[in-house]
Amino acid sequence: RYEDYAHLIEHYRGGYGQFSNVCMINEANYVPAANEKYTYIELGNIGSYGNITDCTVAYGKDLPSRARRVVHTNNVILSSVGGSLQSCALISSEYDNAICSTGFFVVRSNAINSETLLTLFKSEVMQNLLKQSCSGTILTAINHTELQKIVVPKIRKEVQDKIAENIQKSIVLRNKSKSLLENAKVQVENVIQTGGV
């Protein structure tokens, strides 16, 4: 139950705060210029590890009407849709100034580093708090007001630093494995094209 998960956080020895006091949400609407090209991130582009797996590059006139939020490096985007709350990602420098769907909350914090924020959003405790704050009948979602009420643990700085270090290491390794996979694919294609010679 919501009370049980909230109780866990409220008894965390490092303390806690309401989301509204710990995090900031960028809700500013940005209207893309019709003839400018943009990088657009939507729900389907979010990987299971809190990474962005793909994006759409398109002119403003070709983007959907929900493409209205600008994101910056180290923002964390969190899906507001009930069935996809686990879809959250850390914005890397590669996606600085990209646009994301209004189906995401764009979050940052001065008290919690981005990697820890991402880890919190993906944790079982926070996922359950988010789920239980959703409303709606056909398509449930969490709204801004309910999100602001959720309690967030204040993680100690040394723990945050360790989390950040581990997340950054995993990003480097993931990028390296992606590069190795691409190289392997090229080698296989070359072998096929040359008839195995």
Predicted regions and their residues:
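Non-catalytic DNA-recognition/assembly elements of restriction-modification systems
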Residues: 1-32, 156-197
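Sequence-specific dsDNA recognition surfaces
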Residues: 20-29, 44-73
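Hydrophobic alpha-helix feature that most strongly marks membrane-spanning transmembrane helices
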Residues: 27, 82, 86, 122-125, ...
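Short, surface-exposed loop/turn microsegments at beta-strand edges and helix-strand junctions
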Residues: 32-38, 56, 69-71, 90-102
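A structural connector/turn signal
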Residues: 65-66, 94, 137
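A short beta-sheet element
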Residues: 77-121
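A short glycine-rich beta-alpha junction/loop motif
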Residues: 84, 98-105, 135-161
